[in-house]
Amino acid sequence: MKVVTVRTVVVAGAVCLGASAAAAQVVKQEVPGIRNFAKVESTVACAGAITADAVPAVKKMGYAAIINLRLATETGADIEGHTAAAKAAGIQYIHIPFSAANPDPAAVDVFLKAITTPGVAPAFIH
């Protein structure tokens, strides 16, 4: 249990430090169908919930992959619709369910592996 806790704390700390360092580089944009779009750097953008209709716009912006951290049980998550839209648009779609209320260290490991896989960057994370 201690290893899991330490790993989670280290990852959370790294994310916070990275976010702080990158804060000056964050570019926010208004994109139809995408809430709170923020380009963190040339290889990563983050946003709130998106609609399946917004997936082609993500591809058009040059992203190679969409990493969806929403739980399938969330209102409006529409994992199947997003998967189909990504396939139609020719963009990779990676669904890693993550609960902020009950974080799973295994999901963190899956995310870290996904984000470092060649061909995934630039990645759009929501």
Predicted regions and their residues:
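Bacterial N-terminal signal peptides that target proteins for export
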Residues: 1-10
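Hydrophobic helical h-region of N-terminal Sec-dependent signal peptides
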Residues: 11-15
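Cys-dependent protein tyrosine phosphatase-like superfamily
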Residues: 7, 18-123
